[in-house]
Every structure is written in structure tokens, then in C-alpha cells.
Amino acid sequence: MKLTAIAVMPMLLAACTKDEVNPTPTNGGKEGEIELILKNESVADGTRAFGSGTTESWEKSISSAVLIVYNTSGTQILRRVLTAAEVNGSTTTPIKFVLPGVSADASCDFYVVINRNIADNITTKAKLLEELESDIASYNGTYANVTTKAMRSGGFVMTGATTAKIAAGTTAVTMTVKRVVAKVEIQTSMTDSFRTKYGNGCVEVKKVTLSRGAEKSFLIDQTTSKYATVSSSFTSAQDAYCDKTGASKTNAYKYNNLFYINEKAAAATGSRIKVVLNAVYDADGNLSTTTDQLAVTYETELTGATGGKIARNGSYKVNAKLDGLTGQDVTLAVTVANWDALSTQDVNLGQ
């Protein structure tokens, strides 16, 4: 998703209409007109292959947006709240407003926040950078829900930031906007090795739980220098969805889960995001009979792209491959997908 703002100088409009959000200032002809275009590809809702890292329509839907501009001292010089109608129509009808008191060669910091309110008392860049996102739980829910709609009211929060020097003529500002959360898809299946060992026996995954996730993250990406100092106590559990597509036996079933989590810095083994699979082993592969079932648990960690690092707007596919029943033997291969780029992690579980 791209957001483009174009500043045109000198001023082309003599005055603003009385209902304009930001009145035209009188400051010696240093005003600039901003022409804002929000670009967001429109795709129809539909079924897709699980684990492809595709960005769904509800994951990039825009309901509201705000543009905030700061001068070099970090003081807010413009805030423009955009309505849903303005945002959705901006590709054909650019949004125009005034950037006051800016001379050529001056540098300005541009920030865009989508699908989230910014309090009126946040009037400096420093205060905006202190803002935290703390509602990660609201993104998660049942598999049926998270794979068909945005669970968070208002949609996925997205932000972008860039610095631009104002030119004497037209200043074009291009900004990349990213979701503040990461996406994790987990698919569990039994391997040929499992079927060789246990014949018709199968494992039915009941629930998958992620834990040790970051409770909060900064609203504005600052990961080049720091992460929000928060606890790693976020936990989310979800019943597994059984995918029987193309399966002739229960030991060929696949089990799917999807979570959204906050960014998290790379960490040593034992401190990364933990994945727990709660399942039952069925000796004869007939899941309708329970006398031959045994509870089993598998544990592993998310490797992220590398070292357990989870990036905002990152997409991670975990292939959990069950080789046995002990839950001790774990091998992971992660694919990082875009959203930014799909990262896949394969993990072999059991012996």
C-alpha cells in the first residue's frame, strides 16, 4: 500500500472555503498546498490458499486516516483528519489542504495513521513517538472469524512515516504504510514417517496456543533503534480448523490456525514466542471412538525470519510436521511472507 502526498508551491488557491478543516493562514506567501492520494488496491473477498501470505481485503481496508506534519523542532504544523469518503475517493479526487509557514529547503516529518484515533493533546513528534498499541487481543478470535473479517473494531491499524525537504516548486512525498501487527499462520500435518510408525493411527489437533508475545508495541515503527519496553505475557489460544481436502484417511488431515501478534525483538531460545499444540492420538484413526485416544502435547518456538524476531507487517507460515508422539523432536522451517514477505518455518515434532 502506498500513500502519496504532493505539496505545490507557490500557493494556488487564494483562500479556503469556510468549511475547510484548516483555514488558510496569512504568512507572507509561504503557504503550500498539499494534494494527498491514498492508494489501496481493491480486491474482492474470496477464498484463498491457506498460508500463502496473501493480504486479504479486510486486512487493508481503510475506514479513517490522519496526516500529521511536524517541523524540524518536532512541533506540529498541520493535522488533517480524513473521512472514509475522502480516503476511499482520493485516488480519483485528491485531498487538498494547506501546509502553513513552510519555506523552500525546510525539512518536514510526515506521519500517517490509519484506522486509529490520535488524541488532540498529542501535538509534538515526541509525544506521537511515545504512543503505544495495546489492543493486540482484539485482532484475534476463532479461526472462522479471523479468516473472514477484521476482529478489531475499525480495522487494522497502519502507519507510515517519512521526512521530506520542501522544494521551491512541487514537492512529491511518497510514504509506505504498514500494518502494526504481524500475521502467523500455522499448519499441522502428519508425515510419512508418522504413518510408517503408526499405520492408521492419527493425531487430531484440538487447540494451538501462542504465548510469550509482546503485550504492546510502539504505534510508530522505531525498531531501527528500539522496541517498546513491555512484558512478553501476551497469550492467545485458538481451536484448530481441520482441513480434510484431498485426504482419504484421518492421518492425512491438516489442521490450520491463524494469529496476529505484535512485533518482538530477536531473543535467545527459551525467550521467543512459544507455540503449544494440544492434541489427541487416536490409535485406529477412527476419531468417533475415544477409548483408544491419548492426550499429546507438542511445543516449539517461532523463529521468525531469524533469531525469533517478529517484524510488524511480517507474515509467518509455520509448517508443524508430526513425526511421532513424544513432542521432543522439533525441527522448524519458517517462510516469511508479504504482507512484507512470507517466512515459512517447518518444524518436525515427535519421534
Where are these regions (language model features)?
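A short, Gly/Thr-enriched small/hydrophobic beta-strand-prone motif that recurs across taxa
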Residues: 22-48, 178-192
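Short, polar/proline-rich extracytoplasmic segments that appear immediately after membrane translocation
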Residues: 22-27, 304-351
